[in-house]
């Protein structure tokens, strides 16, 4: 009985914390509609996030924080991902996107998935769409940078493409729990629009 109540209490605290974070985000939401125009998805995030990179199939927004930054990237892919191969496919996709779009500080460096610590994989439903959630650690190939990431990949049956939205944090020697909570809260607001 105690354990059941602790789980219920813990979930209630998380739900209330998420509601409060959304309330604060909605005080000053962004007017940026690039994600909506490009991919047909709406994402609620604060106006303090600024676009870092915007290409034909990739959007990267960033918020500066003390000693680092919070990042959200979004892109679509046409790939054959199934329950049998999603954990390998997602990591390979992340690494190829990192090499293409997310450079490190040094020449020839770029973001990849850290393989030393096995990421966690989950099946999810978000905005009524089935998909996958991956939580793990990113690092920079050929440099010494790393941090946590959370990656959602959702199937859009209308376009027959996967929508990928990912949050990652770089804040050396800082507790990243609140940063990752903010990124996850923002990402879970994703909605398909016409």
Regions found by a protein language model. Name each.
Residues 1, 99-159, 174:
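Signature of long, low-cysteine stretches enriched in small and polar/charged residues
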Residues 2-22, 43, 49, 162-194:
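Surface-exposed amphipathic alpha-helical segments
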Residues 14-20, 27, 64-67:
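Charge-rich, low-complexity N-terminal segments
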Residues 25-53:
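N-terminal "mature-domain start" segment
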Residues 46-105, 139-141:
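Secretory pathway targeting signatures of secreted, lumenal, and periplasmic proteins
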Residues 70, 131-134, 161-167:
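Glycine-rich, often proline-containing surface loops adjacent to acidic residues and nearby aromatics
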Residues 70-73, 144-145, 175-179:
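A short, polar/proline- and glycine-enriched secondary-structure boundary/capping micro-motif
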Residues 87-91, 95-112, 173-194:
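Long, compositionally biased interface segments
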């Amino acid at each position: 009985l105690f354990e059941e109540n602790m789980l219920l209490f813990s979930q209630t605290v998380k739900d209330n914390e998420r509601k409060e974070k959304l309330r604060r985000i909605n005080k000053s939401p962004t007017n940026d509609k690039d994600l909506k125009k490009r991919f047909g998805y709406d994402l609620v995030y604060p106006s303090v996030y600024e676009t870092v990179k915007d290409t034909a199939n990739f959007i990267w927004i960033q918020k500066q924080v003390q000693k680092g930054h919070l990042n959200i990237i979004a892109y679509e892919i046409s790939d054959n991902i199934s329950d049998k191969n999603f954990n390998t496919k997602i990591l390979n996709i992340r690494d190829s996107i990192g090499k293409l779009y997310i450079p490190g500080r040094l020449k020839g460096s770029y973001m990849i998935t850290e393989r030393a610590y096995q990421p966690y994989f989950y099946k999810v439903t978000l905005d009524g769409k089935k998909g996958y959630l991956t939580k793990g650690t990113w690092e920079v190939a050929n440099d010494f940078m790393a941090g946590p990431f959370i990656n959602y990949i959702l199937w859009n049956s209308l376009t027959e493409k996967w929508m990928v939205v990912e949050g990652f944090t770089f804040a050396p020697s800082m507790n990243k729990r609140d940063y990752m909570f903010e990124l996850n809260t923002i990402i879970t607001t994703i909605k398909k629009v016409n």
